[in-house]
Amino acid sequence: KLVVKEASRCLACGICAECMQCVAACKANAIDHSMKEEVTELKVGSVILSPGFDEFNPRPLFHYGYRKYPNVVTSIEFERMLSASGPYQGELLRPSDRKPPQRIAWIQCVGSRDESLGRGYCSSVCCTYAIKEAVIAKEHTPFELEETIFYMDVRTHGKDFDKFYERGKAAGIEFIRAKVYEVEEVDGTGNLLLKYLSDDDKPSTREFDLVALSVGLEPSPASVALAKRLGIQLNRYGFCHTNAFSPVETSRPGIYVCGAFQGPKDIPETVIQASGAAGSASALLAPARNTLITKKEYPAEKDVTEEEPRVGVFICHCGMNIGGYVDVPQVTEYAKTLPNVVYAENNLYTCSQDTQERIKAAIEEHGLNHVVVASCTPRTHEPLFQETMREAGLNKYLFEMANIRDQCSWVHMHEPEKATEKAKDLVSMAVAKARLKEPLKPLPIPVNHSALVIGGGVAGMVSSLNLAEQGFKVHLIERTGDLGGIARRMHYTLGSDGVQTFLADLIKKVKEHPNIKVYLNTWIVYAYGHVGNFTTEIMRYRGVTIEKIDHGVTIIACGAEEYKPNEYLYGSDPRVLTQLELEEAIAKGEPDIINCNNLVMIQCVGCRNGEHPYCGRVCCNQAISNSLKLKEIKPDMNIYILYRDMRTYGFYEDYYQQARRKGAVFLCYDPEDKPKVSQVRKDTRYLIRVEGSDPILGEEVAIDADVLALSVPMVPIEEARELATFYKVPLNEDGFFLEAHVKLRPVDFATDGVFLCGLAHGPKLIEELIAQAKAAASRATTILSKDTIMAEGIVSSVNEDICSGCGTCEAVCPYGAIGVNRKKKVAEVNEALCKGCGTCCAACPSGAAQQRGFTTRQISAMVSAGLGV
């Protein structure tokens, strides 16, 4: 306690005493007291702002007891507590007494959706991360945890996030719709008593061992100061101001924005927006492309094929992620005993820049010709170490990685001795393989500098225009007779009435741009090829003539369509409309709509159910948008919105509150007790009766409506499955296209050279699909801007001497990369198409197909090492 108190005093004084204790304590040698502030002048053609965010500090909310009661923590602190490098080494303990909590509560919307704090917006990410923390906490504890999340609305609106919400409920997480108004400590226990009002407006209390406050996102003071220096307009909350049709452009031309500074968002959206901002900047700077590029030079590659293997092993602590559970020094000493290992060391962080220099120095000093790194996942870090190999003059495929974090320390947190022994086995297996590794030479592939964009909606046109403005030829395919897609039916968004003006201008630019060739009434009938060199066969006007288009990349932006419900009298009563149909009717000024007295909206029709288990994402905003427009036309119109959770995330929360102030009535319903709709006769006409339960009143309500609007989701188009087959890209279980990685590659497919954007990826608002369309174009540019690209070296190869030409490999290959040469009667591999999945090697009955980098000999050596034989 004395040490902590002294450290707090020292850090609080704000003046460095130059005691140098921090230098001595820092194992990474990252602190240099001699460094001085420098002012550097850079000449640039564009600026991208991504200064991030601060988390809300809940200390002013005294009723929650943060910093008053030790067992009240923020969600960020709770997540840190779960970390292997956190204060309790990944063990879930209470701060007050270091005992495991049995009952944990999360309080949502702390610092969000609160006008009294000047933070009326929704922070968008808190609901999902609270569920994530609750799920992980259950995984961290060997006993049954009681977990409760107190919420206003569960806003898991991201792609597949609602399924995660359902997974949380299935795991036993309790969700209570309530407003917590006070947290008190129970005398002598450290426990916390939550006082709250549930949705029936009745006060209740519950006792918990630990409380996590789900704090919101806010702009940092430094970001606000930066914006003022740059002359950038901010919104009323201090975030960067943008508009729906240019979501990555600031108020100052040439300066772009991405990430949470533009508005609260999660990692996938942030990465998408970052690529979108880069795409906009690239279009602006296209005339100057490559004029300031300095090509990186590598030393000549050493020929080590005739040398005896000399293996160097580098074992990572990864802070406490590995070192907290695995005895890294012991594993290092073990590695030194393995065959052909001539050098081994351990590092605090092997991925750090200084360790890369150490690896290069060790290669030179000890004559290493093979390198093994035992650390985290090769998915994220293998390219870094392979680059270090090249910089040291070695073939990058002479590198091998052992994953002793994901496959060892993380799954054996409570068994350090066994984790250490397993780490030894994993290192032994990696060394056994590394000894047998051979240099590989990737195949250079020439690049066709044109793009094919599938879909003439907003996403497809924005992608096409961005690529065209960067100087690339674009073939834009649209299966209907008009450009515009579903946006042709849209007239306004929250905050803007200019959808049709924007759309008309976009169509005009696309049609007039010399680099874009538009194909209307055109269908794709077949596609083949590989990254840099695709060929797509098209058919126009459903005719018989087939045309071929050669292109280097493909962007799939084929859109989606509005779901047509088979309930609530839709299709049998013309007064029952979808939200999009209602929007069209309002825009046309149809008297039966704009003059009606009672209008009811039902949310989540056809989604968040067994048929479509995802959230429609845009439906709540559509309902609010139409409500505000109708209230503007006829203020005394009675509008009732029956909802499960109002998901007006981000700054759209302002419009939700505006609709409430203007008199729209919101009634929450339970999915187990959905509203009932029927026709009833009243005097000389039939009305639409909507019946449901009001949890606040605690009784049934019945509304006789003139018009009923159903909030329905977007669903994939039928052609999506055909396109997925042609371009060998996956769909998720809902029929939307599936990205390569939700966070690392959110607009890429696993198939190189094919990208996605727009509603084909999943439901989203117009500003989101515009950002994603620019992101897809930006990612495509990484290929189109090169004359050649290198194929992967780890591909299949065929030993023609023992190949029987049976065709088994051809039948199982998911990429069409291997086939039987009918003249030679042996299989041949197209290395540009091969992704190195190894399916053909596993299926080959003669053993003729071998995977470079994963040969049978190498895999057998790993198995033998793992078994100790």
Q: Which residues make up each language-model segment?
A:
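Residues forming the flavin
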Residues: K1-V869
